[in-house]
UniProtKB/Swiss-Prot annotation:
Belongs to the NAGSA dehydrogenase family. Type 1 subfamily. It comes from the Bacteria. The keyword Oxidoreductase applies. This is N-acetyl-gamma-glutamyl-phosphate reductase.
Length: 344
């Protein structure tokens, strides 16, 4: 069994990680930490996990205890993994970080977007960006994995086939994305209150969202050149889900885009290219580690529209983290992740 530690188990990504690992046949959660909830039983905080983690209680983070684990997940706000990851890596423990701490390869760029100096720039050379559909082989050999964000996952998977094939104009990319309220986290905030978010929808961070440099970094690598991306996120009155509507222009309108996408993702267990003309729904991926994609070329012109949907807490966070765990430890990539989307 893989001995697992979790730092920061009280947020939405933390409890989703617990839910997924409870059904994983090769992983056992041995340590879970929370400074604010130390001493509280996991089953008392999350009744849905009763019978799965009996006897497991939250504890104050301790590097020695965490260092005895085979792998430690960080489901924490940015900056926390900076302080602990180095010590764990020195102890031989693998680190899978769900926060943004090691996603950007440029420490100065990270500091610009997150409002503080990068706390562990020396570790960036060891960090592997954990998008399996791009970096599977690097993940197998990794010590430190940076799990992609939710918007970046849906957006990159939607644009990748076009950019890798050199079909899309990389200077004219648009990502119009919608997120459920759980993407804002579990902390109390006026904008996340039911009376504020219910029956309403709004754009936010149009001037610049923290996920913009992460998305641009990935698309730049796919295109092999700089990209021009306009990214506009929106908050919608649902709990889970990301719906990304992506726009790109192509010079060659004779290419069979459906075939291109189907070929690119033919061997990817968690990317579902839907039949031509489809419109994927966020509810179809609720609770599932799946990205569903449909590609359109309206009126047969040079504008391509890609629709990409994920569950922000699963393929956009904790499910992708478990997918990385499976790859890292040489397991079947689908282990513990075979859940169908929850309907209705």
């Amino acid at each position: 069994m893989i001995k697992v530690g979790i730092v920061g188990g009280t947020g939405y990504t933390g409890v989703e990680l617990l839910r997924l690992l409870a059904q994983h046949p090769q992983a056992e959660v041995a340590v879970i930490t929370s400074r604010s909830e130390a001493g509280v039983a996991v089953a008392d905080m999350y009744p849905n996990l009763r019978g799965h983690y009996d006897g497991l209680t939250f504890s104050v983070p301790d590097s020695k205890t965490l260092g005895a684990c085979d792998v430690v997940f960080f489901a924490t706000p940015h900056g926390v993994a900076h302080a602990l990851a180095g010590e764990l890596l020195a102890a031989g423990t693998k680190v899978i970080d769900l926060s943004a701490d090691f996603r950007l390869q440029d420490a100065a760029e990270w500091g610009k977007w997150y409002g503080q100096p990068h706390g562990a720039p020396e570790l960036l050379k060891d960090a592997v960006y954990g998008l399996p559909e791009v970096n599977r082989e690097k993940i197998r050999q990794a010590r430190l994995i940076a799990v992609p964000g939710c918007y970046p996952t849906a957006t990159q998977l939607g644009f990748l086939p076009l950019l890798e094939a050199g079909l899309a104009d990389p200077a004219r990319l648009i990502a119009d994305c919608k997120s459920g309220v759980s993407g804002a986290g579990r902390g109390a905030a006026v904008g996340s209150l039911f009376c504020e978010a219910g029956e309403s929808m709004k754009a936010y961070a149009v001037k610049g969202h923290r996920h913009l440099p992460e998305i641009s970094q990935g698309l730049r690598l796919a295109a092999g050149k700089d990209v021009g991306l306009t990214f506009v996120p929106h908050l919608t009155p649902m709990i889970r889900g990301i719906h990304a509507t992506l726009y790109a222009t192509v010079a060659d309108t004779s290419v069979d885009l459906q075939a291109l996408f189907e070929k690119r993702y033919a061997n990817e267990p968690f990317v579902d290219v839907m039949p031509a003309g489809s419109h994927p729904e966020t509810r179809s991926v609720r609770g599932a580690n799946v990205c569903r994609i449909a590609v359109h070329r309206p009126q047969g012109g040079d504008l391509v529209v890609v629709l990409s949907v994920i569950d922000n807490l699963v393929k956009g966070a904790s499910g992708q983290a478990v997918q990385n765990l499976n790859i890292l430890f040489g397991l079947d990539e689908r282990m513990g992740l075979a859940h169908a989307g929850l309907l209705p």
